[in-house]
Regions:
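A solvent-exposed interaction/effector surface
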Residues: 1-142
């Protein structure tokens, strides 16, 4: 089971018309600016998380929330937070060297038509120290 409390920044976006790419790039700029320094004291793991949740459709259409942050046991004033609890999910591991790697990893997952997605929450876990990206997709089946 995955059980995480994430604090950081939040946007609502859509993949329609490449809007998410623009919105998430702006979110990253904000996070890695002033916001990241404030959050470091609350960080309980060396990872950075991106959480996609509250899907109003699937990955191709409809709005969803995107959080960029850290795992923490605290909630911090001025920052968004979300709780992720997943019992059924599939894990994908990829090398990570730049933001384009995330898009290529997502394309690989989106192309997998056997994946039975639940659209509860999906996570990207960035391990910058080891150049790894782990993507966790909520599924209907194990």
């Amino acid at each position: 089971m995955i059980n995480k409390h994430i604090i950081g920044l939040k946007i609502t976006t859509t993949n329609e018309n490449n809007q998410a790419q623009e919105d998430i790039n702006q979110l990253r700029k904000s996070f890695y600016g002033q916001s990241n320094a404030e959050l470091q004291t609350f960080k309980k793991e060396p990872y950075t998380y991106v959480v996609y949740t509250n899907y109003q459709g699937d990955f191709q259409q409809g709005n969803y929330d995107c959080y960029l942050g850290i795992a923490s046991e605290s909630t911090l004033t001025g920052f968004a937070s979300c709780d992720i609890k997943l019992e059924k999910y599939q894990i994908f591991d990829f090398p990570y060297y730049n933001p384009q790697d995330t898009l290529e990893a997502r394309k690989t997952i989106w192309a997998d038509q056997s994946l039975k997605r639940a659209y509860l929450a999906d996570l990207e876990i960035y391990d910058f120290e080891h150049n790894r990206l782990q993507i966790i997709i909520s599924t209907i089946e194990d």
